[in-house]
UniProtKB/Swiss-Prot annotation:
Pfam families: Ribosomal_S6. Keywords: Chloroplast, Plastid, Ribonucleoprotein, Ribosomal protein, RNA-binding, rRNA-binding. The keyword Lipid metabolism does not apply. It comes from Thalassiosira pseudonana. SUPFAM superfamilies: Ribosomal protein S6. InterPro entries: Ribosomal_bS6 (IPR000529), Ribosomal_bS6_CS (IPR020815), Ribosomal_bS6_sf (IPR035980), Ribosomal_S6_plastid/chlpt (IPR020814), Transl_elong_EF1B/ribsomal_bS6 (IPR014717). This is Small ribosomal subunit protein bS6c. GO terms for biological process: translation. Binds together with bS18 to 16S ribosomal RNA. One of its GO terms (molecular function) is structural constituent of ribosome. Belongs to the bacterial ribosomal protein bS6 family.
């Protein structure tokens, strides 16, 4: 049996979303995580910001932060669904497990 690991994901979306559309998009992906047996799901909108450089001809983007716990094998499935979403400009998944050894 695999153990769950805490993850944090930052997603950069195109700026075309209004607040309601952004909430709907985030809710749908939170549901997708839930279907993959993720738990402790937290979604935070970090707002619309200017980008340091253009990405896919976009100068601004919406930032979404999603924190969750999941079994590692499901992360690849979820990441591939983000890759095929035309509204996603970039995303990053971080393992939040504390692996630091204390001496």
């Amino acid at each position: 049996m695999s153990t769950t690991i805490k993850y944090e994901m930052m997603i950069l979306l195109t700026e075309e979303f209004n607040d309601n559309e952004l909430k709907t998009w985030a809710f749908n992906y939170a549901k997708a995580l839930r279907k993959l047996n993720a738990s402790e799901i937290s979604v935070i909108s970090r707002g619309k910001r200017d980008l340091s450089y253009e990405i896919a001809n976009q100068k601004r983007g919406n930032f979404i932060q999603i924190s969750f716990s999941s079994i590692p094998k499901y992360i690849e499935n979820f990441s591939s669904s983000l890759k095929f979403d035309s509204n996603v400009l970039r995303f990053l998944v971080l393992n939040k497990t504390n692996n630091v050894k204390k001496f």
